[in-house]
Swiss-Prot record:
Protein name per its UniProtKB record: Error-prone DNA polymerase 2
Native source organism of the sequence: Rhizobium meliloti (strain 1021) (Ensifer meliloti)
Top-rank EC class of the record's enzyme: transferase
Keywords (A to Z) from UniProt: Cytoplasm, DNA damage, DNA repair, DNA replication, DNA-directed DNA polymerase, Nucleotidyltransferase, Plasmid, Transferase
Family: Belongs to the DNA polymerase type-C family. DnaE2 subfamily.
The organism's taxonomic lineage, starting at the top: Bacteria, Pseudomonadati, Pseudomonadota, Alphaproteobacteria, Hyphomicrobiales
Stored Pfam families: DNA_pol3_alpha, DNA_pol3_finger, HHH_6, PHP, tRNA_anti-codon
């Protein structure tokens, strides 16, 4: 018999189902089910994934949605045509607008207003009077499109319920239809279904009760089984196919229309684009346009006209022009940097005159996919650009894409463990043993953690957590991907308010809109642009030089000399340990060397085995040979090694006769070959084409395997060049203005790879004087102060580094001392009006010492005498005398001051850094007795020497391309050391590697040129020694840099559901009309 399952919930109903659309469609196809109706709850978030699963299996998708109404009524709705679909998306947008983030409030009256063209299936609970009222309503609204679901609930008298429900349906002239209310694709997912129910409801498996499914029957069943279960209702079974026939709407009917962007009255979008392009040519090439660049621009304009992309280019041009008019630094990157048109419009900075661009990497007629222009803005000012877009295009036509937050290993173990009621300390132990968000925990790791692998709940937790990994947890907003439309955006997709004010998000992510060929504009944030903007402002103010990204001197020898020494901490892109290790081997001397440097430390070139051949050829250890002049023309700049995606495309075009579009299809298939196997269809064409052009079969196959090896991670040359521009500029500032660079970098946190402690240490090593936070001299930001008699400048640390201090309180302090500095704690308190709690934060940061000579404990003792509301009698007297009076002053008390070690611990605890001695300086004698050398001694030791070094753990990295090798950076009072931990040692010492804040390493020095590593053989946790530094109960954990993948998550994969790491507390905002001085803030006791 023919049957379609029309009530299928995927895991995009977020913790209400346990299977993906891919699993459901694949299973349904094997069972002979003809179509699936996907009805996620109050959402279309997973419908595009269902469309792709439908395309992959050839099974029909019926687009639908389950509406859970406020009165308790539930209706399955399916649009029969395009107009009905738009009414559904508008209805969902209405409900989400009322409900706010992750909620949807819809009433039956709303459904009645939007019901035209929708098929409605009532999902009843019992055949009672409530059901009768609901049937009457649905019959009135939906007419002949009204149905009622017959579904086995596995409760007493199920068959009697079905019989009575059928009678009620006949009475109200509503047709019956059989559904199975599918929540998972196969019986084995039942336990996971119960667990996600527990997670959603916040209960454990022991007390969830009737919230869980009462039976294990919510899986897909073949048509024959459904006929056996509903023998008395053959018509209701047959009607499933009736609804499939009536619902002819497909998501592929959605026609995306980009906003019309003419900009110039009387001109079309294409004419406007051409006008601005040739206007930009005059600005970019004042001495005349080179012939080959003109040819490139005309080629691009013609292709843009053919593809009808002119409005898109004009939109990005408008956004960039607005940002520049507001003094906001921005730069385009990615494949868009292959466009000469983007360059002359000022969107990108890669000059086609000096760079060999490949436009087909960006826009290809054969590919027929929308272009993707990524533009980076200062991360502190990007919100101005976002709000301008909303204001310009309207909230009804502009919204951000969503991002799907999925379960990774840590989050899965945490949530499943709570659902199964594991003890919190056991969950914490399991989670702490995981390196990355995607790593699994097996029996071996369980034993290493000292746990019992035979414990049933523990074993079940690990198994179910493995099943949960990859499942969607919730939707969040994309970093900056805007979808803009000509007509109403909610005609295409539901829109919901974002958590942030004045933002809204569509329910689809970037992969969904790409599948439907929607255009998006990426308005991204880049911290280094904020840093550069602040650096330029400081240089102008204090050095009286006006420079910007465009006027920084190019190919500066001193800058490249600094880069070759790997003196790049804090700079852009080349500050990681892997990049620093490569710099002395690459020895960049030109801008193109820097482009290669940015791209070469990537998984693609490493997995394609291209790094070592390139380095050997660069060092003259291997001869560069080109079989033909054509190949030499393509690869001569990279010494015969195809390091970039454009290189692979040009090899295919020049050596195998591919067109530009075919070469881009090859690139894209290489990027997905691991998942689809699509690259194999190009192998014969590439190999045979190269053989026809005179290459040997062996060389052709080697070329293909090389391209295949790196294709999935290949880096576009244009993207590398865009990043190299900023990398060079940041290094130039560091080279010539190290004081400015330090201040700007600290003022732009959080960003980059390293914590403020390492940034300050590096600046001091470059001769920069760094001055402490001071209540009379520090502003919110770090500033430059003149050094008497030298003409130089020192960096004064700003109050932004004081943990817990509010921005508004800092502003009041600065304003209050404008006329004269504070003379005492009481004077500061009275004049600034900040709450006592803020004074405590400043005292704990030792901010009273520089100008008032008050040690921490003295300042805290003085603050303890203050009240947020002074006694009225004393206040009046003090105001009259314009000074503190004797009755307000505390008697002098001599306190025992903190030790140097205690002060260092307090510095780290309250500012994240110290200007005193390094913590290990206090431990050096003890370490020396154990024959532990300094980091400086270790890094200058000869090759092969065995030694033991120790230091604070700054960074732990385990790149996916490094085959499990761990790279650790440690620091002591003499500098840093780079540690290599092989996979076997990592597994043996996992708890030390992941848990130690201070570590000792016994190993052997490995020296290759200027690159030095300590290859670990044994690891020891010295965190207890570090904690004893302050002789206190709490463990002292110095802050790690943002590049530490264990403390801060794997790059790009942070688990957003985890608790925020300890650090700077949320700051408030200074609102002039908010009389914050009237708020009562309880002061804190210091004991």
């Amino acid at each position: 018999m023919r049957y379609a399952e029309l009530q299928v919930t995927t895991h995009f109903s977020f913790l209400r189902a346990a299977s993906s659309a891919e699993e459901l469609f694949a299973t349904a196809r094997l069972m002979g089910i003809e179509a699936l109706g996907v009805v996620d709850r109050n959402s279309l978030a997973g419908i595009v994934r269902a469309l792709e699963a439908s395309r992959a299996t050839g099974l029909r998708l019926v687009v639908g949605c389950r509406l859970d109404l406020q009165d308790g009524m539930s209706i399955l709705v399916y649009p029969t045509d395009r107009a009905a679909y738009s009414r559904l998306t508008r209805l969902l947008t209405l409900g989400k607008g009322r409900g706010g983030k992750a909620n949807c409030i819809i009433h039956f009256d709303d459904v009645a207003l939007y019901a035209e063209g929708l098929i409605g299936i009532l999902v009843p609970d019992l055949a009672d009077e409530v059901c009768a009222v609901q049937l009457r309503k649905i019959a009135e609204v939906f007419g002949d499109r009204a149905y009622v679901s017959l579904c086995l609930r596995r409760r007493p008298n199920d068959q009697l319920q079905l019989h009575e429900l059928t009678n009620l349906a006949v009475k109200h002239r509503v047709k019956t239809i059989v559904t199975n209310d599918v929540l998972f694709h196969e019986h084995g997912r039942r336990q996971l279904q119960d667990v996600v129910t527990c997670i959603r409801t916040g209960m454990t498996i022991d007390d969830v009760g009737f919230e869980r499914e009462r039976h294990a029957d919510r899986y897909l069943k073949p048509p024959e089984e459904m006929a056996r279960l509903f023998p008395a209702y053959p018509e209701a079974l047959a009607r499933t196919m009736e609804i499939v026939e009536r619902c002819r709407f497909s998501l592929e009917e959605l026609v995306y229309q980009y906003p019309e962007e003419a900009l110039i009255l009387g001109m079309t979008a294409q004419q406007s684009l051409q006008h601005y392009t040739w206007e930009g040519v005059r600005a970019r090439y004042p001495e005349g346009l080179p012939t080959h660049v003109e040819k490139t621009i005309r080629h691009e304009l013609a292709l843009i006209e053919t593809m009808k992309y002119a409005p898109y280019f004009l939109t990005v041009f408008s956004i960039v022009r607005y940002a520049r008019s507001q003094g906001i630094l921005c730069q385009g990157r990615g494949s868009a940097a292959n466009s000469a048109v983007c360059y002359v419009l000022g969107i990108t900075s890669i000059d086609p005159e000096t760079n060999d661009l490949l436009f087909e990497r960006f826009v290809s007629q054969e590919r027929d996919e929308p272009p993707d222009i990524d533009v980076d803005f200062e991360h502190e000012r990007r919100e101005e650009v976002i709000q301008w877009i909303y204001k310009t295009y309207g909230h009804d036509k502009a919204a951000l894409c969503s991002t799907v937050t999925r379960y990774r290993a840590k989050g899965a173990i945490r949530d499943v463990g709570k659902a199964l009621d594991l003890p919190e300390d056991l969950i914490r132990t399991l989670s702490s043993g995981i390196w990355s968000w995607s790593e699994t925990v097996g029996e071996r790791q369980v034993r290493e953690l000292g746990l019992n692998p035979d414990d049933r709940r523990l074993t079940l937790t690990l198994r179910l957590a493995q099943q949960l990994m990859g499942a969607p947890r919730n939707l969040s907003q994309h970093p900056g991907g805007f979808v803009l439309t000509h007509d109403r955006l909610d005609d295409l997709v539901p829109i919901e308010p974002a958590t942030m004010a004045d933002r809204q998000v569509i329910e689809w992510d970037k992969d969904d809109i790409e599948a439907l060929k929607f255009l998006k504009v990426d308005v991204l944030a880049l911290g280094m642009l904020t840093c550069m903007a602040k650096a330029f402002a400081l240089i102008s103010e204090h050095k009286h030089e006006d420079i910007d990204l465009a006027t920084i001197p190019q190919e500066d020898p001193a800058t490249y000399a600094m880069i070759r020494k790997a003196d790049t901490l804090g700079t852009f892109q080349i500050e990681s340990r892997a990049q620093m290790s490569m710099l002395p081997r690459m020895k960049p001397r030109t801008f193109y060397d820097l482009v290669i440097q940015v791209a070469i430390v990537r998984p693609g070139p490493i997995q394609g085995d291209m790094v070592h051949p390139y380095l050997r050829r660069r060092e003259g250890k291997e001869k560069v040979e080109y079989p033909t002049p054509e190949l030499e023309a393509v690869l001569h700049k990279t010494l015969g090694v195809p390091l970039f995606q454009e290189s692979a495309m040009r090899v295919a075009m020049v050596c195998a006769g591919f067109t530009g579009g075919e070469a881009d299809q090859l690139r894209k298939s290489m990027a997905t070959f691991k998942f689809t196997g699509g690259v194999s269809r190009f192998k014969d064409k590439l190999v045979n084409g190269m053989i026809r052009n005179g290459y040997t079969k062996e060389f052709a196959e080697k070329t293909f395997s090389q391209l295949e090896g790196f294709g999935s991670y290949g880096f576009p040359e244009s993207h590398a060049a865009s990043f190299a521009l900023i990398a060079y500029a940041s290094n130039y500032i560091k080279c010539y203005f190290p004081d400015v660079f330090c201040a700007a970098l600290l003022n732009s946190q959080p960003m980059g790879f390293y914590a403020p402690a390492q940034i300050v240490r590096d600046a001091r090593e470059h001769g920069v004087e760094v001055r402490p936070i001071c209540i009379n001299r520090s502003r919110w930001d770090c500033m430059l102060e003149p050094i008497d008699g030298s003409g130089g400048h020192a960096v004064r640390l700003g109050m932004r580094l004081v943990r817990g201090l509010a921005t508004a309180d800092a502003a009041r302090i600065v304003a209050a001392r404008a006329d004269e500095p504070f003379t005492s704690v009481d004077d500061m308190w009275r004049r600034s009006g900040v709450p006592v709690a803020s004074l405590v934060e400043l005292a704990e940061a030792d901010a009273f010492l520089p100008s008032l000579s008050l040690e921490r404990r003295d300042a805290l003792w003085a603050i303890k005498a203050l009240r947020d509301e002074p006694l009225p009698l004393f206040t009046a007297a003090a105001d009259r005398e314009a000074r503190a009076i004797a009755e307000q002053e505390e008697p002098e008390v001599e306190l025992r001051q903190m030790t140097d070690g205690q002060n260092v611990v307090e510095d780290y605890s309250h500012t994240g850094l110290t200007l005193r001695e390094h913590p290990l300086r206090f431990m050096r004698d003890d370490l020396a007795k154990r024959r532990i050398v300094t980091c400086a001694q270790a890094m200058t030791a000869h090759d092969g020497q065995w030694l033991m070094a120790a230091g604070l753990v700054l960074v732990r990295q385990r790149p996916g391309s490094a085959k499990g090798v761990m790279f650790i950076t440690i620091e002591d009072e003499t500098g840093i050391a780079n540690i290599v931990v092989w996979p076997k040692l990592f597994e043996r010492s996992r708890r030390v590697v992941l848990g130690a804040s201070m570590m000792a390493i016994n190993g052997r020095i490995q020296r290759e040129g200027e690159v030095v590593h300590l290859v670990a053989q044994q690891l020891f946790d010295l965190s207890a020694d570090l904690s004893s530094l302050a002789e206190r109960d709490g463990a002292f954990r110095p802050p790690t840099g943002r590049g530490d993948e264990f403390a801060h998550g794997s790059p790009g994969s942070a688990d957003s559901r985890g608790k925020a790491p300890p650090g700077v507390r949320a700051r408030d905002i200074l609102v002039p009309d908010l009389h914050i001085d009237t708020l009562k803030i309880k002061s804190r006791n210091f004991q």
